[in-house]
Swiss-Prot record:
Known glycosylation sites: N308, N878, N893, N1126
Keyword Cell membrane: yes
Domain of life: Eukaryota
Region of interest: Disordered: 1-62
Name of the protein: ABC multidrug transporter mdr1
Gene Ontology CC entries for this record: membrane; plasma membrane
Gene: mdr1
Transmembrane annotation, as ranges: 108-128, 162-182, 234-254, 257-277, 339-359, 371-391, 779-799, 828-848, 896-916, 926-948, 1016-1036, 1043-1063
C-alpha cells in the first residue's frame, strides 16, 4: 500500500482544498440523527474516550450554543466554520399571512371568493339595523297615533320581506365561505406537512443529533393541526365578524355621525385590550408548545423501547420524566388562558359601557331635536352589533396566535439550508469510477460535541475491488469512517477521496447511490419483505426495470443473503409485512433482509458495519460466504467485532483512539503480535484445548454416550407427540367452528380487544369530568360566574327595551326622558363592570381546569399505554408514531369540552334560558312565536356537531397513518439517507394525504349546509318576530316596551344558541378523543402490571422449567414458534441457548419475562406457574440485557438507576456495578462523569458503551435470574472479554440464561441447549457436544479463528 502523503505542507494544502469545497454555498446532507438505529460509533460522540482532560463537557440533550465561543476556542477558524454550518438554523419571523405561503392560484381564488362571501355574510346584520330603525319609527308612529294603520302595515310587510331576502343571502354566503375556508385550510396544511417532511429529509445528520423523532411527530401532527385550525373556518368567522363591525360603523356614521363618533371612542380601549392581551398569549403559547415537543420526544423514546421498560418495571419512573414536561407546559398554558379570559372580560365590560354612553348622549340629541328615535336606535343597534362582532373575533384570535407560534417552529426547519442536501443537483457525477477510497490527513469532530476530536490525522488507502477491515475497541472511530464515506458529516480537516476526487465536490445523491450500507442494528420499514429489499434499487439503473425483472433481482439477493428459505417458509412469503421497525422478525432475519437490500443493486462500494453481528453461527457462515462473494470486484469496508469474519480481508486496519495503530493482512498482523493479535487471542476458540478434551473424554463409557443419544431422541419424540396433540386440538376446533383457523389463532383472536366500542355521550362526559374532579372548586366558581356572565345579555336586552321606550316618549315628557335616560345609562355601566368581573373569574377558573385536564389525560394515557402488554404494541395500529401522535393530538382535542368552550356553552345556555323566561313573563304571545324557531336552530347546530364528529372519526385514522409513517421514516433517518429513499418516502406520504383530502371534502360539503342554515334562520326568526309583533302593536295589544323586551330577548337568545354551534367542531373532536381515551383506559391487558393479583414472592431460588410449551406470536397466529419446548434449569446454573435465527431462543427469554403467555404447556419458576404469580413481584427478581441496548435521554447515572425502583442507591453500589460492567473507567474519563447526558436514545455513546451501561443497570437489580439475549454482540473483542468476565462473575450464585451467537462466550456454560425450529435437538456441556460431533460441533467449526493459509 502506498505510504500516505505526510508533512505540514501537504496537510495545509488538503485543509485549504477542504475549505474551498465546504465553503461552496448550500450543499446538503440527509440526516443521520435521532435514528432508532441507535448508532454506535456513528455519532459515537462517546468517542469521548478521547475527550481532552480539560475539555468542557456539553449538555448533549440540548442544542450546541453556536454563540458560546468557549466551546470552539481550541479550534481553528475554518474548523469552527465547518462545525457551525452543520448546526446553523435560521430563526424565522412568521406573520399570519406567511401561513399562506404555499397557496396556489387556485387556492388564492377560492380564498378570495370565500373571503368576499364571508364579508358579505357579515354585512347582512348591520343592514338589518337600518330596517330595525325604520320599523322603530313606524312603531313610534302607530303608538302615538301619528301613522294610519294601512300605511304602517305596508311599511311593516315591506321591511319583513327585506329580512327574508337578507336571510337567503346569508345562507348562500355562509355556505360558500365555510366550504371554501375548510377546503383551503386542509389543502394548505397538507402542503405544509409535505414541505416539512421534505425539509426534515433534507437535513444533515448533525441537525438530527439534537432533534428527537418524537419532536418531529409532534410538529407534523399537533402543530400542523394548530395551523389548520388557524386557516380554516375560523378565518371565515373572523372576516364575517370584522365585516359586521366595519359595516355597522359605516351605517352608524351615515345615520348620525356625532353620536357614532362619541361611541367609537371606546373602540380605542377595545383595541388596546386586545393588542396587549394577544402579545402575552403568543409568548406563553410558544413556551407551552416547546414543552409539549420535549415531552413528545420522551414518549417516543419510551414507546419505541417498550420491551426494555417492561422488563425493568421502569414505567413509573419514565412516566414521571414525561410528566415533568407536561407540568411545564401546563404552567404556560394556564397563564395563556387566564390572560385570554381577562381580555374577553375587558372587551365585554368596554362594550356595555359603550351602550350606556351612547344611550345617554342619544337622549340629549333627541331632546335637542337633532335626531329622531329611529336614527338613535339604528346608530346604537349598529354600534351594539359592531362591538359584539368585534368580541367574536377574540376567541378566534387564540387559534391564530397558536397557528403562528406553531408555524414559527415548522418554517424554521423548512427554511433551513442543509449543508449536505440529498435533493441538491450540485456537485459532479462521474461517468465511470473504479472505487478507490482514500482518507488524506482526515480530522473529524462531531458538531454536537465540538470539544471532542474523534479522528486525528488519519491517512488510509482503500483500493478498488479490495476488502478493507477496520477493527479496534468501542469508540476508536471505526464507524466514523463509514459516516464520512457516506457523507453523513463534513470532516473538519483533510479530504476523503473517491478515485482522486474530493467527495465534497461530488453530487451527494449520486455518491450515496453508489454505496450500500449494512449497519449493526438494521432498520426495516413497516411494509412487505419484498418492498424492503426493493428499496435497495432506488436511484440505481435497475429502478425502472419490469416487475418480473425486479422480483428476480430481489429473490436472487435474498438467496445470496441466505434469506430466501426462511422467507418462503412464511405464509405470505415475500408479501409478509415485517411490522414497525421489522419487529415481527428475529434479529438475524432482519439482518439478512438488510444484507439482501444492500446487495440487490450490485453496488460498487459496500460498507458493512458489523453486518453479521446479529446472526447465529450457521447463518453467519453462509451469509459471510455470500458477503465475501458479494465483495468480489467491489470496494468493501468492513467493521467487525467478530474477527472470524474478516480473516480474508486484503487489509486489516487496527484503530485505537481515533488513530491507526497498525495495518496489514490477518497473518502479518498475527505474526506482529501487536494490537490485532491481542484482539484475536481474546476471541479465539482454542481448538487445541478441544482436541485435548476430546482425547481425555474418549475413554468415557460407551453406554453413557449411547444414553445421551437416546435422551436426545426421546426428547425429540416427546416433543413431536405433544405437537401432534396440539394439531389434534386444532383439528377438533376446526370441525367445531367450521373455520380453517388454528386453535392458537382462535385463542389469540380472543385477546384482541373490541376495535370500536360505542359509548354514550353521557358516559363520555362523565369520563372526561373525572379528570377534573380535584378541580371541583374551580369548576363551581367557573360555572357560577358563567351563569352570571350569561345573565348579562338578557339584562342588557331588558335595559335596551327600557331605553327604546324612554326615547319614544312624546315631547311633552322630555323632562322624564332625561331623568330615565340617566338612570338606565348608569345601569348599563354597572352591568359592564359585572361582566368584566364574571368573565375574568370564569376564564381563570376554567383555564386551570382545562390545562390540568390536558395534563392529567396525557399523563394517564401515557401510563395506560405503558400498562399494556407487549402484544398490544405488536399490532400495526399501535405503532410508535401512532401512539405518540395520539398523545399529542387527541389530548389537546379533549379540551373541547372544558375551559373556554364549556364556559361559553353554559353562558349561552343561561342567556337563552333567561331570555325565554323574561320574554314569556312580559309578553307570552310574541315570545311563543319567536321561541318556536329556536328548536329548529338547535337541531341545525346538533346536526352539524354530529356531522363533524363523523368527519373527525374518518379523518383521524388517515392522518394517524400518515403521521406514523413520517415518524417511522424520520426515526430511521440514517437508513433513509443511505438508501437515498428521501423522495420515495415523501411520495408515499403525499399519496396518503391526498387520499384523505378527497375523503373529507364530501363531509365538509354536507356539514356546512347545516351550519349555513343555522346562521340564516336567525333572519327568518327576526322577520317572523317583527311581522307578528308589529301586528300586535298595530292592534294596540302591546306597548313598544313589551314588544322590544320580547323581541330583543329572543333575538339575542337565538344568536347565543348559534354561538354554541360554532364550538361544534371542538366538541366533535372532544367526543371522538374521549371515546379513544375511554377505549384505551378500558382495555385491560392479559398481563397487567397494575394488577395486585397473583402470589407475591418474598424470595426466589431460580429453578426454571419449560413444560411442553407451544407458542405463536399474537400477530402471526399461523406461524408456530415453539413446538413443545421442554427445558429445565437448576438454581444457580448457567444455561446457554444456541441455534439458527428464528428458532425460538429469544422467544424463550420473552416468555420467561412474561412479555407473552404460552398457548399450551407452562413456564414454572421454583415449581410455581409464572402466570399465577404477581407480575411485578416476579419481574423484580429478573434482569434482562438484550441485543440492542436501550438508553433514554438523561444522564448516565439516571439511566443506570432505572434498573431499580428506589433513587437512594449508595455511591458505592453504583461504582461497584459500573466496575463489574467495565464502564467505570470510561465514565470517569468524561468531564462530567456520571452526569454526562447520553442524548436521544443514548446516541452520544457508541454501541459498546451503551451495552455496558445497560449491563450495569441490569446488575444494579441484583437479580436472582439473569437473562442475556446476546448481551455482548455489540462489543469489540477487548471489551467483550472484560464484560464476559464480569457477566461470568455476576452469574455466580444466580440462575443465568444466555442466548449467544458468539460461541466463545458460552463455552463455560453448565448446559448448552441447541435449538432448531422451536425444539431442543441436543443438549450438554461444551465438551460433550463437541465430542458428539452434532449440530453444535458444526456451529463451533464455522466460527473457528484458525490462521488462513
Amino acid at each position: 500500500m502506498p505510504a500516505p502523503e505526510t508533512g505540514a505542507s501537504s496537510r495545509e494544502k488538503s485543509l485549504e482544498d477542504l475549505q474551498v469545497a465546504t465553503l461552496e454555498k448550500g450543499r446538503s446532507t440527509s440526516s443521520f440523527g435521532a435514528d432508532n438505529e441507535k448508532p454506535h460509533d456513528h455519532h459515537s460522540l462517546s468517542d469521548t474516550i478521547m475527550a481532552p482532560p480539560d475539555g468542557k463537557q456539553k449538555d448533549h440533550g440540548k442544542a450546541v450554543d453556536l454563540n458560546d465561543d468557549s466551546l470552539f476556542a481550541h479550534l481553528q477558524e475554518h474548523e469552527k466554520e465547518v462545525l457551525k454550518r452543520q448546526l446553523d438554523a435560521p430563526s424565522v419571523k412568521v406573520s399570519f399571512f406567511t401561513l399562506y405561503r404555499y397557496a396556489s392560484r387556485k387556492d388564492i381564488l377560492i380564498i378570495l371568493v370565500s373571503a368576499i362571501c364571508a364579508i358579505a355574510a357579515g354585512a347582512a346584520l348591520p343592514l338589518f339595523t337600518i330596517l330595525f330603525g325604520s320599523l322603530a319609527s313606524a312603531f313610534q308612529g302607530i303608538s302615538l297615533g301619528t301613522m294610519p294603520y294601512h300605511e304602517f302595515y305596508h311599511k311593516l310587510t315591506k321591511n319583513v320581506l327585506y329580512f327574508v331576502y337578507l336571510g337567503i343571502a346569508e345562507f348562500v354566503t355562509v355556505y360558500v365561505s365555510t366550504v371554501g375556508f375548510i377546503y383551503t385550510g386542509e389543502h394548505l396544511t397538507q402542503k405544509i406537512r409535505e414541505n416539512y417532511l421534505e425539509a426534515i429529509l433534507r437535513q444533515n445528520m448533525a441537525y438530527f443529533d439534537k432533534l428527537g423523532a418524537g419532536e418531529v411527530t409532534t410538529r407534523i401532527t399537533a402543530d400542523t393541526n394548530l395551523i389548520q385550525d388557524a386557516i380554516s373556518e375560523k378565518v371565515g368567522l373572523t372576516l364575517t365578524a370584522f365585516a359586521t363591525f366595519v359595516t355597522a360603523f359605516i351605517v352608524a356614521y351615515v345615520k348620525y355621525w356625532k353620536l357614532a363618533l362619541i361611541c367609537t371612542s371606546t373602540i380605542v380601549a377595545l383595541v388596546m385590550v386586545m393588542g396587549g392581551g394577544s402579545r402575552f398569549i403568543v409568548k406563553y403559547s410558544k413556551k407551552s408548545i416547546e414543552s409539549y415537543g420535549a415531552g413528545g420526544t420522551v414518549a417516543e423514546e419510551v414507546i419505541s423501547s417498550i420491551r426494555n421498560a417492561t422488563a425493568f418495571g421502569t414505567q413509573d419512573k419514565l412516566a414521571k420524566q414525561y410528566e415533568t414536561h407536561l407540568a411545564e407546559a401546563e404552567k404556560w398554558g394556564v397563564k395563556q388562558q387566564v390572560i385570554l379570559g381577562m381580555m374577553i372580560g375587558g372587551m365585554f365590560g368596554i362594550m356595555f359601557s359603550n351602550y350606556g354612553l351612547g344611550f345617554w348622549m342619544g337622549s340629549r340629541f333627541v331632546v335637542g331635536k337633532e335626531v329622531n328615535v329611529g336614527q338613535v336606535l339604528t346608530v346604537l343597534m349598529s354600534i351594539l352589533i359592531g362591538s359584539f362582532s368585534l368580541g367574536n373575533v377574540a376567541p378566534n384570535g387564540q387559534a391564530f396566535t397558536n397557528g403562528v407560534a406553531a408555524a414559527a417552529k415548522i418554517y424554521s426547519t423548512i427554511d433551513r439550508r442543509s449543508p449536505l442536501d440529498p435533493y441538491s443537483d450540485e456537485g459532479k457525477v462521474l461517468d465511470h469510477f473504479e472505487g478507490n477510497i482514500e482518507f488524506r490527513n482526515v480530522k473529524h469532530i462531531y458538531p454536537s460535541r465540538p470539544e471532542v476530536t474523534v479522528m486525528e490525522d488519519v491517512s488510509l488507502s482503500m483500493p478498488a475491488g479490495k476488502t478493507t477491515a477496520l477493527v479496534g475497541p468501542s469508540g476508536s472511530g471505526k464507524s466514523t469512517v463509514v459516516g464520512l464515506v457516506e457523507r453523513f458529516y463534513l470532516p473538519v480537516g483533510g479530504q476523503v477521496l473517491l478515485d482522486g476526487h474530493d467527495i465534497q465536490t461530488l453530487n451527494l445523491r449520486w455518491l450515496r447511490q453508489q454505496i450500500s450500507l449494512v449497519s449493526q442494528e438494521p432498520v426495516l420499514f413497516s411494509t412487505t419483505i419484498f418492498r424492503n429489499i426493493e428499496h435497495g434499487l432506488i436511484g440505481t439503473k435497475f429502478e425502472h426495470e419490469s416487475k418480473d425483472k425486479i422480483r428476480e433481482l430481489v429473490e436472487n439477493a435474498a438467496r445470496m443473503a441466505n434469506a430466501h428459505d426462511f422467507i418462503m417458509a412464511l405464509p405470505e412469503g415475500y408479501d409478509t409485512n415485517v411490522g414497525q421497525r421489522g419487529f415481527l422478525l428475529s434479529g438475524g432475519q432482519k439482518q439478512r433482509i438488510a444484507i439482501a437490500r444492500a446487495i440487490v443493486s450490485d453496488p460498487k462500494i459496500l460498507l458493512l458495519d458489523e453486518a453479521t453481528s446479529a446472526l447465529d453461527t450457521k447463518s453467519e457462515g453462509v451469509v459471510q460466504a455470500a458477503l465475501d462473494k458479494a465483495a468480489e470486484g467491489r470496494t468493501t469496508i468492513v467493521i467487525a467485532h467478530r474477527l472470524s469474519t474478516i480473516k480474508t480481508a486484503h487489509n486489516i486496519v487496527a484503530m485505537v483512539g481515533g488513530k491507526i495503530a497498525e495495518q496489514g493482512t490477518h497473518d502479518e498482523l498475527v505474526d506482529r503480535k501487536g494490537t490485532y493479535y491481542k484482539l484475536v487471542e481474546a476471541q479465539r476458540i482454542n481448538e487445541e484445548k478441544e482436541a485435548e478434551a476430546l482425547e481425555a473424554d474418549a475413554d468415557m463409557d460407551a453406554d453413557d454416550f449411547g444414553q445421551e443419544g437416546v435422551t436426545r431422541i426421546k426428547t425429540a419424540v416427546s416433543s413431536s407427540n405433544s405437537l401432534d396433540a396440539v394439531d389434534e386440538k386444532a383439528r377438533l376446533e376446526m370441525k367445531r367452528t367450521g373455520t380453517q383457523k388454528s386453535v392458537s389463532s382462535a385463542v389469540l383472536s380472543k385477546k384482541v380487544p373490541e376495535q370500536f366500542e360505542k359509548y354514550s355521550l353521557w358516559t363520555l362526559v362523565k369520563f372526561i369530568g373525572a379528570f377534573n374532579r380535584p378541580e371541583l372548586g374551580y369548576m363551581l366558581i367557573g360555572l357560577t360566574f358563567s351563569f352570571l356572565a350569561g345573565g348579562g345579555q338578557p339584562t342588557q336586552a331588558f335595559l335596551y327595551a327600557k331605553a327604546i321606550s324612554t326615547l319614544s316618549l312624546p315631547e311633552s315628557m322630555f323632562h322624564k326622558l332625561r331623568h330615565d335616560a340617566n338612570f338606565w345609562s348608569l345601569m348599563f355601566f354597572v352591568v359592564g363592570i359585572a361582566q368584566f368581573i364574571s368573565l375574568s373569574i370564569n376564564g381563570t377558573a376554567f383555564a386551570i381546569c382545562s390545562e390540568r385536564l390536558i395534563r392529567r389525560a396525557r399523563s394517564q394515557a401515557f401510563r395506560s399505554i405503558l400498562r399494556q402488554d407487549i402484544s398490544f404494541f405488536d399490532r400495526e395500529e399501535n405503532s410508535t408514531g401512532a401512539l405518540t401522535s395520539f398523545l399529542s393530538t387527541e389530548t389537546k382535542n379533549l379540551s373541547g369540552v372544558s375551559g373556554v368552550t364549556l364556559g361559553t356553552i353554559i353562558m349561552t345556555s343561561t342567556t337563552l334560558g333567561a331570555a325565554m323566561i323574561i320574554a314569556l313573563a312580559i309578553g307570552w304571545k310574541l315570545a311563543l312565536v319567536c321561541i318556536s324557531v329556536v328548536p329548529i336552530l338547535l337541531a341545525c347546530g346538533f346536526l352539524r356537531f354530529y356531522m363533524l364528529a363523523q368527519f373527525q372519526q374518518r379523518s383521524k385514522s388517515a392522518y394517524e397513518g400518515s403521521a406514523s409513517y413520517a415518524c417511522e421514516a424520520t426515526s430511521a433517518i440514517r437508513t433513509v439517507a443511505s438508501l437515498t429513499r428521501e423522495q420515495d418516502v415523501w411520495g408515499v406520504y403525499h399519496d396518503q394525504l391526498q387520499k384523505q383530502g378527497r375523503k373529507s371534502l364530501i363531509s365538509v360539503l354536507r356539514s356546512s349546509l347545516l351550519y349555513a342554515s343555522s346562521q340564516a334562520l336567525v333572519f327568518f326568526c327576526v322577520a317572523l318576530g317583527f311581522w307578528y309583533g308589529g301586528t300586535l302593536l298595530g292592534h294596540h295589544e302591546y306597548s313598544i316596551f313589551r314588544f322590544f323586551v320580547c323581541f330583543s330577548e329572543i333575538l339575542f337568545g337565538a344568536q347565543s344558541a348559534g354561538t354554541v354551534f360554532s364550538f361544534a367542531p371542538d366538541m366533535g373532536k372532544a367526543k371522538n378523543a374521549a371515546a379513544q381515551f375511554k377505549k384505551l383506559f378500558d382495555s385491560k391487558p392479559t398481563i397487567d402490571i397494575w394488577s395486585d393479583e397473583g402470589e407475591k414472592l418474598e424470595s426466589m431460588e431460580g429453578e426454571i422449567e419449560f413444560r411442553d410449551v407451544h407458542f405463536r406470536y399474537p400477530t402471526r397466529p399461523e406461524q408456530p414458534v415453539l413446538r413443545g419446548l421442554n427445558l429445565s434449569v437448576k438454581p444457580g446454573q448457567y444455561i446457554a441457548l444456541v441455534g439458527p435465527s428464528g428458532c425460538g431462543k429469544s422467544t424463550t427469554i420473552a416468555l420467561l419475562e412474561r412479555f407473552y403467555d404460552a398457548l399450551a404447556g407452562g413456564v414454572f419458576v421454583d415449581g410455581k406457574d409464572i402466570t399465577k404469580l404477581n407480575v411485578n413481584s416476579y419481574r423484580s427478581f429478573l434482569s434482562l440485557v438484550s441485543q440492542e441496548p436501550t438508553l433514554y435521554q438523561g444522564t448516565i447515572k439516571e439511566n443506570i438507576l432505572l434498573g431499580v425502583d428506589k433513587d437512594d442507591v449508595s455511591e458505592e453500589t453504583l461504582i461497584k456495578v459500573c466496575k463489574d460492567a467495565n464502564i467505570y473507567d470510561f465514565v470517569m474519563s468524561l468531564p462530567e462523569g456520571f452526569d454526562t447526558v447520553v442524548g436521544s436514545k443514548g446516541g452520544m455513546l457508541s454501541g459498546g458503551q451503551k451495552q455496558r451501561v445497560a449491563i450495569a443497570r441490569a446488575l444494579l437489580r441484583d437479580p436472582k435470574v439473569l437473562l442475556l439475549d446476546e448481551a455482548t454482540s455489540a462489543l469489540d473483542s477487548e471489551s467483550e472479554k472484560v464484560v464476559q468476565a464480569a457477566l461470568d462473575a455476576a452469574a455466580r450464585g444466580r440462575t443465568t440464561i444466555a442466548v449467544a451467537h458468539r460461541l466463545s462466550t458460552i463455552q463455560n456454560a453448565d448446559i448448552i441447549y441447541v435449538f432448531d425450529q422451536g425444539k431442543i435437538v441436543e443438549s450438554g456441556t461444551h465438551h460433550e457436544l463437541i465430542r458428539n460431533k452434532g449440530r453444535y460441533y458444526e456451529l463451533v467449526n464455522l466460527q473457528s479463528l484458525g490462521k488462513t493459509h
